[in-house]
Amino acid sequence: MQSLDRVDLCESLLTWIQTFHVDAPCKTVEDLTSGVAMAMVLQKIDPVYFDENWLNRIKTDVGDNWRLKISNLKKILKGILDYNHEILGHQVNDFTLPDVILIGEHSDASELGRMLQLILGCAVKCEQKQEYIQAIMMMEESVQHVVMTAIQELMSKETPVSIGTDAYAELDRQLKKANEELNDALSAKEEIAQRCHELDMQVAGLQEEKSSLLAENQILMERMNQSDSLEDPNSPAGRRHLQLQTQLEQLQEETFRLEASKDDYRIRCEELEKEITEFRQQNEDLITLADEAQSLKDEMDVLRHSSDKVAKLESQVDSYKKKLEDLGDLRRQVKLLEEKNTMYMQNTVSLEEELRKANAARSQLETYKRQVVELQNRLSEESKKADKLEFEYKRLKEKIDSLQKEKDRLRSERDSLKETIEELRCVQAQEGQLTSAGLMPLGNQEPTDSLAAEIVTPEIKEKLIRLQHENKMLKINQEGSDNEKISLLQSLLDDANMRKNELETENRLVNQRLIEMQSQVEELQKSLQEQGAKTEDSLLLKKKLEEHLEKLHEANNELQKKRAIIEDLEPRYNNSSMKIEELQDALRKKEEDMKQMEERYKKYLEKAKSVIRTLDPKQNQGTGPEIQALKNQLQERDKMFVSLEKEFEKTKTQRDQEEKLIVSAWYNMGMTLHKKAAEDRLASTGSGQSFLARQRQATSSRRSYPGHVQPATASDVIA
């Protein structure tokens, strides 16, 4: 990259470094020259390696002190290189390292870009590299392109680091420790030199101030000689003289103290220089030891390689000795094997003749095996469909449970409505007595009084009582229909469960029969190989093969029938679930209609009560239209009740007929299928088999039938 590209790289990496959201400012180049933000970013990249101890070594309050900035940047650069070498196992060879002096003293953007490029390399190769790569992908396209080219440039200049022995690693650790101590001492030396420089500046300033004070003192002395004597403390010149004298003494004490501290810092600086020389000497000694350890390591590798060769040669010599000892035995065995070979040649000739005779039967056996494989695949498909039916059964059972809960809730609401209706009856009876007693003297005044009296007439009371009774009967009929529906659905589920268990047992019996037939086929193969030369045995084997093929065809037909039965059952399951959902929706709509009617009924009652309470001779003229509106609303509600009752009766009769038809069809189908399965089992276990085959099948069915049926029923009951 050119210098212009480096500046662009620095700007792009500045935007990337802001994605870490560190506490230190990191928006400009000057913010990053202190090194604090970069150190915090490194700690976020790997908090185990760049721990708190390492972070505490970075000075935060650097201000404009470029020496402290350079010290921080050196520590960060060393930490990045050590992290690449120790943790990532890479070493940057051809990459130009950043000049920390230019960064700290002049805020060079190109060198800062190199430093940020090294931090970028640590981020995309650490353990959380996916997170940082994703953050780069979310940035702008131009910034993303620059960052990707920087990563490619850095990776092209890295080489893997070879792992040394334990001694070399120990020397490496000691060398790093010494380098760290040396860097600490150098940083301390720089700090002390900076402090000495500051003290020198303070001494120079104090000396200038002292000279100015002396000049001022001299001027004052001359003035004092001209005007008043300085010995008189009451005169202003005497007081000024005393003040200047005390100030002079204080400044002298301050200069003495600063000179003493300056001497102390010089002594400390000399001690640190001595320590630096000692550390350098130790570093040189450790480097020589590291070179010696590397040479010893190479020698050890050579010796190890030669010792491996010696061990291999010794093992080869031992194996050759054993082979020579076994050679005589092998020669004797060769003679015996030649004799056996001649005998085996004669046997092979006879066996080849037998093999020619058995080839015809072998082709039939191969077709039989292929049919067995196809039957096994079909059986697995049937088991999958049975699992699907079991899942549908569980789902229907959950729906029944929810319907039961809804039924309980409706019962509780019915009880609460009963209580409210009884309370309303009591209130209406009391109000009827009050209104009949209060409206007697107003009977001959105006026609509006007669309308008010009609509100509480026995006709309205009878209508209210009749409506309450009808409401109660509708709720009772609704609960009865819910109970009948739940019982019918439960019976359907029980029948489906029984049929599913029967199909599972039949599938398991068919599987057992297939296994037995496969074992019989293997026995037939063995008998063909042993007795292929005998014609009578071959005829018997052919008959047995034909019998087994017939059994296989029968099993295949049974599986196809069961598959068709299961395919017929699946749409009926789906239709029943859809009907249940439709019934639930109708039930919800009816419940909402009932609630709306009850609310209207309560509103009408409250409005009638308010009219009766507010009724007096002065307001009789305005109550007529309201009472007429109430009567109209009561008539509309009666009509609505009648229409709802008719619709409810129609839907109830239609639903009962559909459920009865479904139950009868389901029961007839189950009986026919059960009868067919029993007839097939009786036909399959008939006289077509031999006595030994029937006995073997009877014992296997006695072993497998209880163990397969009982767990299925238990699991279904639990579900």
From Swiss-Prot:
User: Its GO biological process terms?
Assistant: cytoplasmic microtubule organization; cytoskeleton-dependent intracellular transport; early endosome to late endosome transport; endosome organization; endosome to lysosome transport; lysosome organization; protein transport
One GO CC annotation, please?
microtubule
Alphabetically sorted, this entry's keywords are:
Coiled coil, Cytoplasm, Cytoskeleton, Golgi apparatus, Microtubule, Protein transport, Transport
Q: What is its main location?
A: cytoplasm
Pfam families attached here? HOOK, HOOK_N
* Ranges of residues in domain Calponin-homology (CH): 7-123
The record's CDD domains line, in alphabetical order, gives:
HkD_Hook3 (cd22226)
Q: Name one GO molecular function term.
A: microtubule binding
The entry's localization annotation reads: Cytoplasm, Cytoskeleton; Golgi apparatus
Low complexity bias: start-end ranges: 693-704
Ranges in coiled-coil conformation: 162-431, 459-665
Q: Which intervals of the chain are annotated as region Disordered?
A: 679-719
PANTHER family per UniProt: HOOK PROTEINS (PTHR18947), PROTEIN HOOK HOMOLOG 3 (PTHR18947:SF38)
Give the family per the record: Belongs to the hook family.
**Assembly mode:** Interacts with microtubules.
What does this protein's UniProt record list under function? Acts as an adapter protein linking the dynein motor complex to various cargos and converts dynein from a non-processive to a highly processive motor in the presence of dynactin. Facilitates the interaction between dynein and dynactin and activates dynein processivity (the ability to move along a microtubule for a long distance without falling off the track). Predominantly recruits 2 dyneins, which increases both the force and speed of the microtubule motor. Component of the FTS/Hook/FHIP complex (FHF complex).
Q: What is this protein called?
A: Protein Hook homolog 3
